[in-house]
From Swiss-Prot:
Residues 18-163 form the Thioredoxin domain. It comes from the Bacteria. Thiol-specific peroxidase that catalyzes the reduction of hydrogen peroxide and organic hydroperoxides to water and alcohols, respectively. Plays a role in cell protection against oxidative stress by detoxifying peroxides. HAMAP family: Tpx. Disulfide bonds join 60-93. This is Thiol peroxidase. The gene is tpx. It is an enzyme of class 1 (oxidoreductase). Belongs to the peroxiredoxin family. Tpx subfamily. CDD domains: PRX_Atyp2cys. The active site is a conserved redox-active cysteine residue, the peroxidatic cysteine (C(P)), which makes the nucleophilic attack on the peroxide substrate. The peroxide oxidizes the C(P)-SH to cysteine sulfenic acid (C(P)-SOH), which then reacts with another cysteine residue, the resolving cysteine (C(R)), to form a disulfide bridge. The disulfide is subsequently reduced by an appropriate electron donor to complete the catalytic cycle. In this atypical 2-Cys peroxiredoxin, C(R) is present in the same subunit to form an intramolecular disulfide. The keyword Disulfide bond applies.
Protein backbone atom coordinates (compact mmCIF):
# COMPACT_ATOMS: atom_id res chain seq x y z
CA UNK A 1 0.00 0.00 0.00
CA UNK A 2 1.34 3.39 -1.00
CA UNK A 3 1.87 5.94 1.74
CA UNK A 4 2.17 9.73 1.59
CA UNK A 5 1.99 12.44 4.23
CA UNK A 6 -0.62 15.11 4.80
CA UNK A 7 0.44 17.94 7.13
CA UNK A 8 3.41 15.66 7.90
CA UNK A 9 1.15 12.86 9.17
CA UNK A 10 1.40 9.44 7.48
CA UNK A 11 -1.54 8.62 5.21
CA UNK A 12 -2.31 5.32 3.47
CA UNK A 13 -3.67 5.32 -0.06
CA UNK A 14 -6.34 2.87 -1.14
CA UNK A 15 -7.17 1.69 -4.62
CA UNK A 16 -5.35 0.41 -7.67
CA UNK A 17 -2.17 2.25 -8.57
CA UNK A 18 -2.00 3.62 -12.12
CA UNK A 19 1.30 3.69 -14.02
CA UNK A 20 2.58 5.66 -16.98
CA UNK A 21 2.12 3.73 -20.21
CA UNK A 22 -1.02 1.88 -19.15
CA UNK A 23 -4.54 2.45 -20.44
CA UNK A 24 -6.38 4.74 -18.00
CA UNK A 25 -9.15 3.02 -16.05
CA UNK A 26 -12.69 4.33 -16.40
CA UNK A 27 -14.44 6.02 -13.48
CA UNK A 28 -17.81 7.52 -12.58
CA UNK A 29 -18.04 10.95 -10.97
CA UNK A 30 -20.66 13.70 -10.76
CA UNK A 31 -20.59 17.07 -12.48
CA UNK A 32 -21.85 20.25 -10.77
CA UNK A 33 -25.44 19.46 -11.80
CA UNK A 34 -25.34 15.89 -10.38
CA UNK A 35 -25.01 14.27 -13.81
CA UNK A 36 -22.87 11.14 -13.93
CA UNK A 37 -19.68 11.60 -15.94
CA UNK A 38 -17.06 9.06 -16.99
CA UNK A 39 -13.85 8.99 -18.99
CA UNK A 40 -16.02 8.18 -22.02
CA UNK A 41 -17.43 11.74 -21.91
CA UNK A 42 -14.02 13.02 -23.01
CA UNK A 43 -13.26 10.34 -25.61
CA UNK A 44 -10.81 11.42 -28.29
CA UNK A 45 -9.46 14.38 -26.28
CA UNK A 46 -6.20 14.67 -24.43
CA UNK A 47 -6.83 15.20 -20.73
CA UNK A 48 -5.02 16.80 -17.82
CA UNK A 49 -6.63 15.45 -14.64
CA UNK A 50 -5.80 17.60 -11.63
CA UNK A 51 -6.73 15.84 -8.39
CA UNK A 52 -7.10 17.90 -5.21
CA UNK A 53 -8.13 17.06 -1.63
CA UNK A 54 -10.61 19.97 -1.41
CA UNK A 55 -11.31 22.83 -3.80
CA UNK A 56 -11.83 25.17 -0.81
CA UNK A 57 -8.20 25.19 0.35
CA UNK A 58 -5.52 27.63 -0.75
CA UNK A 59 -3.19 25.11 -2.42
CA UNK A 60 -6.07 23.36 -4.21
CA UNK A 61 -7.49 26.69 -5.35
CA UNK A 62 -4.13 27.76 -6.78
CA UNK A 63 -3.54 24.36 -8.41
CA UNK A 64 -6.93 24.50 -10.12
CA UNK A 65 -6.40 28.05 -11.36
CA UNK A 66 -2.85 27.41 -12.58
CA UNK A 67 -3.68 24.32 -14.64
CA UNK A 68 -6.76 25.93 -16.14
CA UNK A 69 -4.94 29.16 -17.04
CA UNK A 70 -1.85 27.46 -18.46
CA UNK A 71 -3.60 24.69 -20.39
CA UNK A 72 -6.41 26.85 -21.78
CA UNK A 73 -4.46 27.53 -24.98
CA UNK A 74 -4.16 23.81 -25.73
CA UNK A 75 -6.61 21.49 -27.43
CA UNK A 76 -7.94 19.05 -24.89
CA UNK A 77 -9.62 19.28 -21.53
CA UNK A 78 -8.56 20.01 -17.95
CA UNK A 79 -10.57 18.17 -15.29
CA UNK A 80 -10.31 18.96 -11.59
CA UNK A 81 -11.50 16.08 -9.42
CA UNK A 82 -12.03 16.15 -5.66
CA UNK A 83 -14.21 14.43 -3.07
CA UNK A 84 -16.04 17.71 -2.42
CA UNK A 85 -19.80 17.77 -2.88
CA UNK A 86 -20.85 18.96 -6.36
CA UNK A 87 -22.64 21.91 -4.71
CA UNK A 88 -19.40 23.09 -3.08
CA UNK A 89 -17.55 22.82 -6.39
CA UNK A 90 -20.27 24.78 -8.19
CA UNK A 91 -20.25 27.47 -5.48
CA UNK A 92 -16.44 27.73 -5.69
CA UNK A 93 -16.56 28.19 -9.48
CA UNK A 94 -19.34 30.81 -9.22
CA UNK A 95 -17.74 32.76 -6.37
CA UNK A 96 -14.45 32.91 -8.27
CA UNK A 97 -16.02 33.83 -11.60
CA UNK A 98 -14.63 30.74 -13.31
CA UNK A 99 -17.09 29.58 -15.95
CA UNK A 100 -14.79 27.32 -17.96
CA UNK A 101 -13.34 25.23 -15.13
CA UNK A 102 -14.56 21.62 -15.17
CA UNK A 103 -14.87 20.33 -11.61
CA UNK A 104 -16.01 16.79 -10.96
CA UNK A 105 -17.02 15.24 -7.65
CA UNK A 106 -15.86 11.81 -6.51
CA UNK A 107 -17.80 12.19 -3.26
CA UNK A 108 -20.49 9.61 -4.02
CA UNK A 109 -18.44 6.41 -4.13
CA UNK A 110 -14.79 7.43 -4.64
CA UNK A 111 -14.79 5.63 -8.01
CA UNK A 112 -12.00 7.77 -9.45
CA UNK A 113 -9.92 7.57 -6.28
CA UNK A 114 -10.22 3.78 -6.10
CA UNK A 115 -9.46 3.28 -9.81
CA UNK A 116 -6.38 5.55 -9.66
CA UNK A 117 -5.12 4.61 -6.19
CA UNK A 118 -5.45 8.06 -4.63
CA UNK A 119 -8.00 7.64 -1.80
CA UNK A 120 -6.52 8.89 1.48
CA UNK A 121 -8.00 6.26 3.80
CA UNK A 122 -7.67 8.22 7.01
CA UNK A 123 -9.36 11.33 5.59
CA UNK A 124 -11.74 10.01 2.88
CA UNK A 125 -10.29 12.63 0.54
CA UNK A 126 -8.30 12.30 -2.67
CA UNK A 127 -4.52 12.67 -2.62
CA UNK A 128 -3.04 15.55 -4.58
CA UNK A 129 -1.98 14.14 -7.93
CA UNK A 130 -1.88 14.81 -11.66
CA UNK A 131 -2.57 12.45 -14.55
CA UNK A 132 -2.09 13.35 -18.21
CA UNK A 133 -3.86 11.11 -20.73
CA UNK A 134 -3.49 11.15 -24.48
CA UNK A 135 -6.52 11.09 -26.79
CA UNK A 136 -6.54 7.26 -26.61
CA UNK A 137 -6.61 7.36 -22.78
CA UNK A 138 -3.03 6.16 -22.36
CA UNK A 139 -1.41 7.55 -19.19
CA UNK A 140 1.57 9.59 -20.40
CA UNK A 141 2.32 11.38 -17.11
CA UNK A 142 1.57 10.73 -13.47
CA UNK A 143 2.55 12.58 -10.33
CA UNK A 144 1.50 11.63 -6.83
CA UNK A 145 2.55 14.48 -4.54
CA UNK A 146 4.33 12.94 -1.54
CA UNK A 147 3.22 15.67 0.91
CA UNK A 148 -0.45 16.47 0.38
CA UNK A 149 -0.09 20.16 1.19
CA UNK A 150 2.64 20.74 -1.45
CA UNK A 151 2.08 21.81 -5.04
CA UNK A 152 2.53 19.36 -7.90
CA UNK A 153 5.27 19.94 -10.48
CA UNK A 154 3.29 22.28 -12.74
CA UNK A 155 6.02 22.57 -15.37
CA UNK A 156 6.47 18.81 -15.83
CA UNK A 157 2.72 18.15 -16.03
CA UNK A 158 2.11 21.00 -18.48
CA UNK A 159 5.06 19.93 -20.63
CA UNK A 160 3.66 16.38 -20.83
CA UNK A 161 0.23 17.80 -21.73
CA UNK A 162 1.59 20.12 -24.41
CA UNK A 163 3.79 17.44 -25.97
CA UNK A 164 0.97 15.02 -26.74
Amino acid sequence: MTQITFKNNPIHLAGSEVSEGQHAPDFKVLDNDLNEVSLENYKGQKKLISVVPSIDTGVCDQQTRKFNEEAAQEDGVVLTISADLPFAQKRWCASNGLDNVITLSDHKDLSFGQQYGVVMEELRLLARSVFVLDSNDKVVYKELVSEGTDFPNFDAALEAYRNI
